[in-house]
Amino acid sequence: MRQHVNPLSRFFQLPLELPAPEQLFDDPGRPIHLDIGCARGICLQELAALRPDRNHLGVEIRRPLVRSAQRDRDQLERLNLHYLFCNANVSLEGWMAALPQDRLQLVSIQFPDPWFKRRHRKRRVLQPSLLLAIAATLQPGRELFVQSDVLAVIDPMVALVELSGCFDRPAEDARPWRADNPLPVPTERERYVQELGLPAYRVLYRRNRQPLPDPEELEIAWQRVDNPANDAVPPDG
């Protein structure tokens, strides 16, 4: 059972100064895989063991999950793994902007909390400002991977990424959904979905060489797509 929290509440809107890679990993020079909304972090634990050539950072808005994940990390002594509590839409942009060029090489957003009602659209994890921060940090060819088992969750993410013009899908990937997970370890939610024989909707993107769109123009264009004028959408609450 997912325990939702409202990312728009005052507590979660307080920006946090996140530690630099030098404070998180034994070798901060390794490429970073950033997993946004890592939940209990078991997938990243296994990835850190399989990919010692990378540093793996999981961020999660539910503090108890972060505490448990970090406790496991310490017991396992995974020095290329760390977990941080934060609201990704409030605290990640500055952290990513401070990274050395091409340090961040993969961003994943896997099975995010399903805020699929229109009136809850501002609670979704992938907002235009976060997407632009990711696009500004990733060098051409570096990857953004998104997946969900809820079409009403994945469809807006895909629409926003493609509206930005900053990312392309690999030519060889199936449309509309990639057949498999490019990561060698499934998340806990993904395992659950697979056990039930249900579909998972996946898209892998690679940063292209297009410049970032104007943030205000992207926001306006996104509102037109995500909140058509003829839809009566009550305020968030």
UniProtKB/Swiss-Prot annotation:
Broad enzyme group: transferase
Keywords: Methyltransferase, S-adenosyl-L-methionine, Transferase, tRNA processing
Name of one Pfam family that matches: Methyltransf_4
Keyword Kinase assigned: no
Gene Ontology cellular component annotations, sorted alphabetically: tRNA methyltransferase complex
UniProt-annotated binding residues for S-adenosyl-L-methionine: D35, E60, N87, D113
InterPro entries: SAM-dependent_MTases_sf, tRNA_(Gua-N-7)_MeTrfase_Trmb, tRNA_methyltr_TrmB_bact
Superkingdom field: Bacteria
PROSITE patterns: SAM_MT_TRMB
Reactions that this protein is recorded to catalyse: guanosine(46) in tRNA + S-adenosyl-L-methionine = N(7)-methylguanosine(46) in tRNA + S-adenosyl-L-homocysteine
Coiled coil: none
The EC number(s) this enzyme carries: 2.1.1.33
Binding locations of substrate: K117, D149
Pathway: tRNA modification; N(7)-methylguanine-tRNA biosynthesis
GO molecular function, one term: tRNA (guanine(46)-N7)-methyltransferase activity
Catalytic residues in the record: D113
Function: Catalyzes the formation of N(7)-methylguanine at position 46 (m7G46) in tRNA.
NCBIfam families the record matches: tRNA (guanosine(46)-N7)-methyltransferase TrmB
Family under the similarity heading: Belongs to the class I-like SAM-binding methyltransferase superfamily. TrmB family.
Protein name listed in UniProt: tRNA (guanine-N(7)-)-methyltransferase
